[in-house]
Amino acid sequence: MVTGKQTELIPIPFPPYQIPYSSKFTDSPAFIYFVAAFSVAGLYSIITSLLSGLALLKPGYAKQLVSHFVVVDVLLLGIVAAAIGAAGGVGYIGLRGNSHSRWTKICNIYDTFCQHLAGSIAAGLIASIVLVLLILLSFFTLSRKIPK
């Protein structure tokens, strides 16, 4: 998403000139939110990896860490899902436009930018599915440690 930037010559009707206009992810708050949400999720995954490694050295803290990880993982899943939805909505308007609001599609002009956008959203969807699977794994691990 961050590397998606494209400059094209856009024709203006009067007089018949073309002006360069660039499109980048900072043009949309939804794209900025997408980058910020996945940056936070990436930083959190690094921190949890380090803490999980430390928990292997001191097994007494493992139950507490897993329970905290499950809660924060679910919160991050909500943030990541909202970011994917916001970026996907703006991307869809860029792809198809909106005739009711008279927003024209831009992906026929900024094709490389839209390809970067689509790739980022697809990678984000895959990452969110992996996050759901990891949350389920953490939940089942935690439920096995609860005495019956």
Curated annotation (Swiss-Prot):
Predominant cellular place of this UniProt entry's protein: membrane
Transmembrane segments: 31-51, 74-94, 121-141
InterPro entries given in the database record: CASP/CASPL (IPR006459), CASP_dom (IPR006702), CASPL (IPR044173)
Keyword Zinc recorded: no
Record organism: Panax ginseng
High-level lineage: Eukaryota, Viridiplantae, Streptophyta, Embryophyta, Tracheophyta
UniProt protein name: CASP-like protein 1
One GO CC annotation: plasma membrane
Similarity comment: family membership: Belongs to the Casparian strip membrane proteins (CASP) family.
One protein family per Pfam: CASP_dom
The keyword Zinc belongs to this UniProt entry's keyword annotation: no
Annotated keywords: Cell membrane, Membrane, Transmembrane, Transmembrane helix
Compartments (UniProt record): Cell membrane
Membrane topology: Multi-pass membrane protein
Subunit description: Homodimer and heterodimers.
